[in-house]
């Protein structure tokens, strides 16, 4: 019998302690142990980006990260994006410009877009498309998503 690992991690600024199997993925723990179901599991192979989260400030596919790897580290998920009732500019622009439809890819796209804008507050359309290439959307295509990110970037710059 495999011994469970004790993990302490910060998720969206809140401290969590849990036990997990050594091979259990971060997306599984987020959804099933911590009940943070905004992060979606689409492919389990890192190809779709639906499970994108920030780990220690780096964009990762949480289906490829073992939960034990987050011990002592910080994780940011879609649940931490809004501040109370105030939506993040990306969330607001996605709603206003119809940058989402079914919602499966949306949390991962929003996390990836936030990571982009934290690194490059004034991306070109080409840079935005390149950055989001790891996030698959089968509903909208990408034009409305890219327009939403570009509008949020402009808003965040105060332009």
Residue ranges of model-derived segments:
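Signature of N-terminal electron-transfer/Fe-S-associated modules in redox systems
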Residues: 1-159
């Amino acid at each position: 019998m495999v011994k469970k690992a004790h993990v302490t991690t910060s998720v969206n600024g809140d401290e969590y302690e849990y036990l997990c199997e050594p091979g259990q993925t971060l997306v599984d723990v987020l959804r099933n142990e911590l009940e943070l179901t905004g992060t979606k599991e689409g492919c389990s192979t890192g190809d779709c980006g639906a499970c994108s989260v920030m780990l220690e400030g780096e964009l990762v596919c949480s289906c490829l990260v073992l939960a034990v790897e987050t011990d002592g580290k910080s994780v940011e998920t879609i649940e931490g994006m809004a501040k109370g009732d105030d939506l993040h500019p990306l969330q607001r622009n996605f709603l206003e410009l119809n940058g989402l439809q079914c919602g499966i890819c949306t949390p991962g796209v929003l996390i990836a877009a936030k990571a982009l804008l934290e690194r490059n507050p004034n991306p070109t359309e080409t840079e935005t498309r390149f950055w989001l290439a790891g996030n698959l959307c089968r509903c909208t295509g990408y034009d409305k998503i890219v327009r939403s990110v570009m509008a949020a970037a402009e808003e965040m710059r105060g332009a």
